[in-house]
Amino acid sequence: MTIQLRQICLVARELAPAIADLTEILGLNTCFVDPSVGVFGLENTLVPVGRNFLEVVAPIREETAGGRYLERRGGDGGYMVITQADTRNSQKAVRANALANGVRVAHEIERDGWSLCQLHPGDMVASFLEIEWDRHEDLSGHWMPAGGSGWEDKVCQAVTVDFVGVELQGPDPEALAALWSAVLGTPVIQDGQNLSLRLNNAVLSFVLQTDGRGAGLGGVRLAVRDREGILLRAKARGCPVTDDQVIICGTRFCLQTE
């Protein structure tokens, strides 16, 4: 069973400023807007990061799940870990693992040649976990949330190359890691105090919440080619920075030089 980290979704109070920060600071392009998220009271934009994607959603009406999440976590931040399964059977296995561990299915779509399963963030503790499959079974190509194809010419890796990992935080990192391990069918790797799961192309790390925002998707690790340029542009746009990290859309982006 192979599971690819294909997309990371952030949630923001306002879409345009978040997308402007992400694209200008990280040297990325927008590639797709999905009108179907309007049924959830949201608007969105997707940005390719290598052959994978960063998405931002924002509420366009009151009383939405995204709006409640913003209130609960005190502002913009991480929202969903979105994965792609190599086969339909792999997707079904993750879904079965979730149900066996008391995790509810929050939303499902079944269409000819495409299937989506979202697992409830209340049960996954740190974020939604979404598992998608489509008949192309191409982990670096066709991707339904980005319109299938047509996004490829928007890929720019001159500054930001790809995802390396995601940081999930909570009050009990060991329990959080064990839960995600059971659902994804991937063993926990323990290196001293560090807990992680390895997906096909990225690592999920589990850490103690220390920022006062509670459990959530707290950070994204990126492979980059121009860390200094990223930090300079982030400072110019008023985003908090350290020597190897910038906070954009309420999310810690750790910059790992290639």
Role assignments for model-derived ranges:
Residues 1-64:
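An N-terminus-focused feature that recognizes amino-terminal "leader" regions
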Residues 4-13, 45-47, 55, 67-165, 196-198, 202-208, ...:
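Vicinal oxygen chelate
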Residues 16-29, 92-101, 172-187, 236:
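Amphipathic alpha-helical segments
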Residues 174, 178-182, 188-221, 225, ...:
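Intrinsically disordered, low-complexity segments enriched in Gly and acidic/Ser/Thr residues
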